[in-house]
Amino acid sequence: MGQPTTTSLFMRDVMFHRMTGTSQAVNDVATLSGERREIIRRALNKKILVPNILELMPAWPSEFQPNIDEVNVEIDEWLKTVNVAKEKKLKHRARGNYTLLAGIYYPHCRKEKMLALSQFLYWIFFWDDEIDTGGELTEDREGTILCCAETNKCINDCLGPEPNYTPPPGSRGTVEMLYPILRDLRAGLSPVSTMRLKQELHDYVNGVKNQQKVRQEDHLPNPWDHFQMRVDDVGVIPSITQNEYAMDFTLPDWIRRHEAMEEIVLQCTKLTILLNEILSLQKEFRVSQLENLCLLFMNTYDMSIEQSIHKVLGLLKDHYKICIEAEARLPWSTTDEKLNNNIREYIRGCQRLATGTACWSYNCERYFKLSQLNDQQELLLDLSRT
């Protein structure tokens, strides 16, 4: 498929229909500010066909780790021991299959490393959903601050200079489960990579705390401010560092801090955010989580939802091009091929952050039903409230 244009996006409105059986959604809308209600009204019941996002990143293939099913057996046993509500565990296991996500992020890692990598992804989705729209802490500012403080303490305990892997008595389940996960990850990381992971996790946790505050405000944020906030705190950056754990190597810090590598990490982060804003739009819209670029461009620039999605797709193409161009500026060695291989592996890990998130979304029902995909992997987004 070629690059999408406005006309190549199949878009159609459907008639406004009665929301019988969706009284919860109606009640949710009634409590929102006028600005938020207006965005819902304008997007409600639209159906938009979105092109296969993987085709917008053609140089980056998707691969699958061969032991996903075997690791899932181990995950199912591990989940029984996790102090999280059974309903939440069942929901995430059925819809998310985060072992699949780990298997796409790290397709060439050894099977024994897959367990900790999969457990980390289960943790990040469990933890994030507590604070995200519809979670236990969505409206609880003090509870969110406390949860983030406990989580930051866990990160310091496990990844700091004097590691302590014992959770404090009374820790919430999503903090308690993180201690052994970080213990296992640290065992396979160099000191410099451990310090990077520590800072990246702090940035993520503090960013989620900031996002929760933004969602409580009456006015929707500017889309560019929202995009920058997501770049600053997005939880995918720790998954790049974990590629060093997965593939048994350490990237020297001077290479990680090289401007071209920083650019690649930044652009792959932006790509992951952009594609996720599109692929998660339906799910977020249905629970009135309106801090989504597709809806924020609508609000700020008086665009239709179709125009807004097209704009996000255009940004995705732009950032992909910037990322490709940055590879030519990397500090390749003329004598150390092992170092060059490690650089290549790190770059592939960055790229798989974007392609892996999209590929996983097309192979589970975290954000939409698989029946909404056609044979060309085009997605028919359904912005109804049912």
UniProtKB/Swiss-Prot annotation:
The pathway is: Sesquiterpene biosynthesis
Q: What happens when the gene is disrupted?
A: Abolishes the production of koraiol.
Organism classification, top ranks?
Answer: Eukaryota, Fungi, Dikarya, Ascomycota, Pezizomycotina
| Presence of keyword Plastid | no
The catalytic activity, as recorded, is:
(2E,6E)-farnesyl diphosphate + H2O = trichobrasilenol + diphosphate; (2E,6E)-farnesyl diphosphate = alpha-humulene + diphosphate; (2E,6E)-farnesyl diphosphate = (-)-(E)-beta-caryophyllene + diphosphate; (2E,6E)-farnesyl diphosphate = (E)-2-epi-beta-caryophyllene + diphosphate
Motif D(D/E)XX(D/E) motif, which positions?
128-132
What is the role of this chain? Terpene cyclase that is able to convert FPP into a mixture of sesquiterpene hydrocarbons and alcohols. The main product is trichobrasilenol. Additionally, side products include alpha-humulene, caryophyllene, 2-epi-caryophyllene, african-3-ene, african-1-ene, isoafricanol and pristinol. Does not accept GPP, GGPP, and GFPP as substrates.
This chain belongs to the protein called Terpene cyclase 6
Question: Looking at its record, which EC class is this enzyme?
Answer: lyase
Task: Name the domain of life.
Answer: Eukaryota
List residues binding (2E,6E)-farnesyl diphosphate. Answer: R366, Y367
Q: Which PANTHER family match?
A: BETA-PINACENE SYNTHASE-RELATED, TERPENE SYNTHASE
One Gene Ontology MF term? (-)-E-beta-caryophyllene synthase activity
Share what the entry says about its subunit structure, partners included. Homodimer.
Q: Where does Mg(2+) 1 bind?
A: D128
Keyword Metal-binding in the entry? The reply is yes
Q: Which Gene3D superfamilies match?
A: Farnesyl Diphosphate Synthase
Motif WxxxxxRY motif — list its residue ranges: 360-367
Which cofactors does the annotated protein need, by name?
Mg(2+)
Q: Which InterPro entries match?
A: Isoprenoid_synthase_dom_sf (IPR008949), Terpene_cyclase-like_2 (IPR034686)
Q: What is its EC number?
A: 4.2.3.-, 4.2.3.104, 4.2.3.137, 4.2.3.157
Keyword tags: Lyase, Magnesium, Metal-binding
